[in-house]
A protein has these predicted regions:
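A short beta-loop-alpha structural element at the N-terminal edge
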Residues: 8-20
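Conserved GNAT acetyl-CoA-binding A-motif
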Residues: 113-125
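Acetyl-CoA-dependent GNAT
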Residues: 39-95, 106-107, 166-167
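Glycine-rich acetyl-CoA-binding "A-motif" of GNAT/NAT acetyltransferases
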Residues: 66-70, 131, 157
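Conserved acetyl-CoA-binding loop-helix of GNAT-fold acetyltransferases
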Residues: 98-111, 131-138
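Acidic/histidine-enriched, glycine/proline-rich intrinsically disordered or flexible terminal extensions
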Residues: 169-203
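Conserved catalytic-core motifs of GNAT/GCN5-like acyltransferases
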Residues: 72, 122-125, 137, 142-159, ...
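Conserved GNAT-fold acetyl-CoA-binding loop/helix
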Residues: 21-48
Length: 203
């Protein structure tokens, strides 16, 4: 397998909303990866993308003009003291697994979050999900606990494991996180995209 697959990681755009909604829908309808019950349509997905991108990155991996996966960061908790921590989420199209797309998207996302000044990334995984747990471990996440029977879906109660990854040193008096739009077009972000895309395997 070669690394030159001709794909790219970039900032999500309005035109990506239908593809992103399509990637996300099976996580709702076909299992318990997501605790949502009704898949959002493209319009609702666009609303979410726009809202997230006011502060955080929302990225996609595109190959042959087709979006195969996406990743984004979001607020971990609304209380002010949490503002240096984020939740991170990634979804890959069902036929594009095992190519390293999720890891590449996370790699790009983490570089940008560091540039913004964030210190900790958190991720929740509905259990059991061996593939997701292993991927997060490979990306440097450590398990910090399990919420038992915290979600009820499809007639069953489900556990959620929580994982954290340090992004940067937890210094005293940290500067305020930089909003993503202030960094989106910089050479540092473009370089992060290129480096991460080089990790993806061909089919």
């Amino acid at each position: 397998m070669t690394r030159d697959v001709g794909g790219l990681i970039r900032v999500a755009e309005e035109r990506d909303a239908p593809a992103i909604a399509g990637i996300y829908a099976p996580a709702i309808t076909d299992g318990v990866i997501s605790f949502e019950l009704t898949p959002p349509d493209a319009q609702e997905m666009l609303r979410r993308i726009v809202a997230i991108q006011q502060q955080y990155p929302w990225l996609v991996y595109e190959e042959s003009e087709t979006v195969l996966g996406y990743v984004y960061a979001s607020v971990h908790n609304e209380r002010a003291a949490y503002r240096w921590s984020v939740d991170v989420t990634a979804y890959i199209r069902h036929d594009a697994h095992r190519r390293g797309i999720g890891r590449a998207l996370y790699t790009a996302l983490f570089e940008i979050l560091v540039l913004q000044g964030y210190r900790t990334a958190c991720a929740g995984v509905t259990l059991p999900n061996t593939a997701s747990v292993q991927m997060h471990a490979a990306m440097g996440f450590k398990e910090v606990g399990v919420y038992h029977d915290v979600g009820y879906k499809f007639g069953k109660w489900h556990d959620v494991g929580w994982y954290e990854r340090s992004l940067a040193a937890h210094v005293l008096e940290p500067p305020e996180p930089v909003p993503f739009p202030e960094l989106a077009g910089t050479t540092h972000v473009k370089a992060a995209f290129a480096r991460a895309a080089g990790l993806i395997k061909s089919t």
